[in-house]
From Swiss-Prot:
UniProt-recorded name of the protein: Protein 5.3
InterPro entries assigned: PD(D/E)XK_Endonuc (IPR021671), tRNA_endonuc-like_dom_sf (IPR011856)
Gene Ontology MF: a single term: nucleic acid binding
Lineage start: Viruses, Duplodnaviria, Heunggongvirae, Uroviricota, Caudoviricetes
Naturally occurring in which organism (per UniProt): Escherichia phage T7
Pfam families, sorted: PDDEXK_5
Length: 118
């Protein structure tokens, strides 16, 4: 298995753990290549979660953490694909709603886009 797949699997497990600690029930889709990586439920409300791992990129002002959300040969996400984007930044998980990321093909996270820490 390649390093990227291992990192992605570890990120999904970290996000599932953090949601569980926050009182959610976590479900896994049967198909591994679905648009949602997890489904979470709390108080009867279900949400589809897409998990991404932030990578370090060089910018004019120093290092930044970035996630790719499509484009450059990859299909872009559309309405209904997921409700929550969970971004793993080192050991932290930042949560963004679909409305916050809709239409983006990449975004820097942390300093610019803080999200909600899970």
């Amino acid at each position: 298995m390649n390093e990227r797949h291992l990192t992605g699997a570890a990120s999904e497990m970290l996000v599932a753990y953090k949601f569980t600690k926050a009182g959610y029930t976590v479900y896994y889709p049967m198909l591994t290549q679905s648009k949602e990586d997890l489904v979470v439920c709390k108080d009867g409300k279900f949400s589809k979660v897409q998990v991404k791992t932030a990578t370090t990129v060089q910018t004019n002002t120093g290092d930044a953490k970035q996630v790719r959300l499509g484009g450059c040969g990859r299909s872009e996400y559309k309405d209904g694909d997921f409700d929550i984007l969970a971004v793993v930044v080192d050991e932290d998980v930042l949560i963004f709603t679909w409305d916050e990321v809709k239409g983006k093909t990449s975004m820097c996270v942390g300093k610019r886009n803080k999200g909600i820490k899970l």
